[in-house]
Amino acid sequence: MRECISVHVGQAGVQIGNACWELFCLEHGIQADGTFGTQASKINDDDSFTTFFSETGNGKHVPRAVMVDLEPTVVDEVRAGTYRQLFHPEQLITGKEDAANNYARGHYTVGKESIDLVLDRIRKLTDACSGLQGFLIFHSFGGGTGSGFTSLLMERLSLDYGKKSKLEFAIYPAPQVSTAVVEPYNSILTTHTTLEHSDCAFMVDNEAIYDICRRNLDIERPTYTNLNRLISQIVSSITASLRFDGALNVDLTEFQTNLVPYPRIHFPLVTYAPIVSAEKAYHEQLSVAEITSSCFEPNSQMVKCDPRHGKYMACCMLYRGDVVPKDVNVAIAAIKTKRTIQFVDWCPTGFKVGINYQPPTVVPGGDLAKVQRAVCMLSNTTAIAEAWARLDHKFDLMYAKRAFVHWYVGEGMEEGEFSEAREDLAALEKDYEEVGTDSFEEENEGEEF
């Protein structure tokens, strides 16, 4: 089997983990104590779900996951929550003191104490796999644990499991809603450190999700639970092809092959449709053509940027539910003709399609309506460079005054790391710019010199 191991780091990672495993359990008919419910045999017609769950001798199903936080409160909620019997106690790892929103604490001082234990637990999980496919790592960019500890973990995973793919689900700090002043520092330091270790990173911008909750789901004041449930639907769509049988299935490595043209350009933009509340869904048709075209609306994106200003390098459409290839082909053909989608000239209109027959499941009492079909679009577009530019600008404003830097240096970091990380991100912005320029323009430039 092609197993995936999920690693949830820091408060954001763990809370998204809660939402995701709650949804996975519902999707596979697994109850809160890990045993199969009555519907399970109907849903799991084969054993694809074992990519995410391992089965114990007495018929319990345990998530192939580790939750790590450098302070105990968030993971304690899991230990006392509804799904406390789902996880093995050793899968929930906590430290004593937190990283205090400080990358250096997560990566150097406090993180160093926990890393070996975490790797040991991960090793136990990998030993139970027959054909490990890779790791899914959930974390935020802004927190100390999410940024610092994740980057340390990624470095070590690269050492121990060199060839295995590592996919990130990263929470990008929201432009408006900030939880810490030093988010830009942490984000840029962690991006720089993990850039060479991550194969593909799906960024989720909190603010974009807030807006979707407000606009599409009519939630006036979205809570983290609302946000996380929406994020879990997206994670579920991306991983559905690993957990269910379908017509066109997509493997983890296949994502990379189709979405990542150059190793550094590995930040696909995620869009999901339909995001509708139950009241609205009742009155809407939501055909394949409709949900496909709403994927190209900036309103459905998980990161605030404008693809109409950028160019697409690759595009991957993951459908689930009541969808047939013919409808998809018609929908995509329509998009190609009427949309102002610009592909880079060196990559003619490449759409990769995956279809999965399992319709999206919704959490009872959640915000999303139960729909017959949904689509998740992963596109690699140069527009996402806007997100980096915003972050870099904030970094520059603070770093020009060397504000807050002493907290990092005090934890054993060198100031040079800041400028090194910032240069790396400047290079990343430049990479995106170059990828978007047309190849024939460059040839003309060469002749002039």
From Swiss-Prot:
The keyword Hydrolase applies. Keywords: Cytoplasm, Cytoskeleton, GTP-binding, Hydrolase, Magnesium, Metal-binding, Microtubule, Nucleotide-binding. It comes from Rattus norvegicus. GTP binds at residues 11, 71, 140, 144-145, 179, 206, 228. Its EC number is 3.6.5.-. The MREC motif may be critical for tubulin autoregulation. Dimer of alpha and beta chains. A typical microtubule is a hollow water-filled tube with an outer diameter of 25 nm and an inner diameter of 15 nM. Alpha-beta heterodimers associate head-to-tail to form protofilaments running lengthwise along the microtubule wall with the beta-tubulin subunit facing the microtubule plus end conferring a structural polarity. Microtubules usually have 13 protofilaments but different protofilament numbers can be found in some organisms and specialized cells. One of its GO terms (molecular function) is GTP binding. It holds the Pfam family Tubulin_C. Some glutamate residues at the C-terminus are polyglycylated, resulting in polyglycine chains on the gamma-carboxyl group. Glycylation is mainly limited to tubulin incorporated into axonemes (cilia and flagella) whereas glutamylation is prevalent in neuronal cells, centrioles, axonemes, and the mitotic spindle. Both modifications can coexist on the same protein on adjacent residues, and lowering polyglycylation levels increases polyglutamylation, and reciprocally. Cilia and flagella glycylation is required for their stability and maintenance. Flagella glycylation controls sperm motility. Mg(2+) binds at residue 71. A motif (MREC motif) lies at residues 1-4. It is found in: Cytoplasm, Cytoskeleton. Its cofactor is Mg(2+). Gene3D superfamilies: Helix hairpin bin, Tubulin/FtsZ, C-terminal domain, Tubulin/FtsZ, GTPase domain. The active site is at 254. This is Tubulin alpha-8 chain. Belongs to the tubulin family. One of its GO terms (biological process) is microtubule cytoskeleton organization. Its main location: cytoplasm. One of its GO terms (cellular component) is cytoplasm. This tubulin does not have a C-terminal tyrosine; however, its C-terminal phenylalanine residue can be cleaved. It catalyses: GTP + H2O = GDP + phosphate + H(+). Tubulin is the major constituent of microtubules, a cylinder consisting of laterally associated linear protofilaments composed of alpha- and beta-tubulin heterodimers. Microtubules grow by the addition of GTP-tubulin dimers to the microtubule end, where a stabilizing cap forms. Below the cap, tubulin dimers are in GDP-bound state, owing to GTPase activity of alpha-tubulin.
